[in-house]
């Protein structure tokens, strides 16, 4: 399978990596009135793109760069590289519910990617953490094994940052799906800039990677976990 087809699989919402049960915070935003329609959805998507979207994309690209380099060097320090990458993701996710969700998504992605592109790297990921490595590390590993570039992997990450909440908003608010996807597409120039910034940062020290978050969304994520009735996991 070509790298392009692999990226299309990884970016497809039907790829069984668990993303369909998450709203990327939209369920909380709808409940507390931050997202009520198309205009506020666009604001939310832009905010997510420039905060968590940038952070995750940089972590994904950094994972591709470092895992590729370690494979070229013979995998002698692979376990340490995975642990270091995973720790950088952990440090950038403050709320326990979001940390748990990221590990579940990473574990699921590792499992399905191992079936699609069998490679010993996935066994190393599974051995690195009992609950699974964080999703950006797993996505980076899947990109490496399938032959995708840091730019391609970061683009998939940004695609998810936009489309996960956009599609959840359709379900929660009954928005016009054509309008919702058009909003996401209209942000393409900004998304391209985020990908470029993420990949540029990924070539530097891990400690200097972006660490942008949305504090209000993080607080809402903790509250969301206490709800008795909810449609999405996050």
Model region roles, listed by residue range:
Residues 34, 38-39, 43, 144, ...:
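C-terminal auxiliary extensions adjacent to catalytic cores
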Residues 7-16, 43-50, 91-98, 124-129, ...:
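A short glycine/serine-rich beta->alpha loop
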Residues 3-74:
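Glycine/small-residue-rich interface belts in oligomeric ring/scaffold proteins
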Residues 69, 74, 78-147:
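Internal, conserved structured core segments that host functional sites
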Residues 13-17, 21, 33, 51-52, ...:
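Short, contiguous, pocket-lining structural segments
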Residues 28-33, 48, 52, 63-68, ...:
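Generic structural signal for hydrophobic core residues of well-folded globular domains
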